[in-house]
Amino acid sequence: YGADVGGDIPMAVEFTRSLRPLLDAYGNAEGFHLIPFTMDETVYSRELAPLAGWYRGVYVGVPWWFIDEPDAMLRFRAATTGFATLYKTSGFIDDTRAFCSIPARHGIARRCDSSFLARLVVEHRITMDDAVRISRDLVGPIPRRAFKLD
């Protein structure tokens, strides 16, 4: 309920209709990148993942800096991976407001992503080699590409 106080309470949001004029004009344009973020879990699979799956320039913002609860992180991956794939997300990002907690937050994000990848391996949806490659990509190439840092 307030900026920078850790009281991040989700509010209902809508992206699909609101972004349609922008995405119709630029969503598949060379060099266009849009990374929407939200705490509204109902939007991930209904709006953001399909938008990222369809538009070349849309990536789903990974909300780890304000959703640092393991079950919510796993729900996010489950809700977005089918449409958007792991490669159309922003990867883990953080802010420096809670500087001392950043290593712990990165650690939990890596463990949750590894848990999600392990599930895909056990279900024979990806190979172990793929899981290892993806786990590396999630902390380097994926965020660098999404934020155009390469």
Model-predicted regions and their roles:
Residues 1-33, 42-58, 72-92, 109-118:
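Histidine/acidic residue-rich metal-binding segments in metalloenzymes
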Residues 4-14, 63, 100-104, 126, ...:
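Catalytic or ion-translocation cores adjacent to nucleophile or general acid/base/metal-coordination motifs
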Residues 33-36, 132:
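Beta-strand segments within the central parallel beta-sheet cores of soluble alpha/beta enzyme folds
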Residues 35-39, 63, 86-105:
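Short acidic/histidine-rich active-site segments
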Residues 41-47, 67-71, 98-102:
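Flexible loop/turn segments at secondary-structure boundaries
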Residues 44, 86-87, 104-150:
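Mid-to-C-terminal alpha-helical segments outside catalytic/metal-binding sites
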Residues 59-70, 91-92, 124-133:
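A generic structural motif
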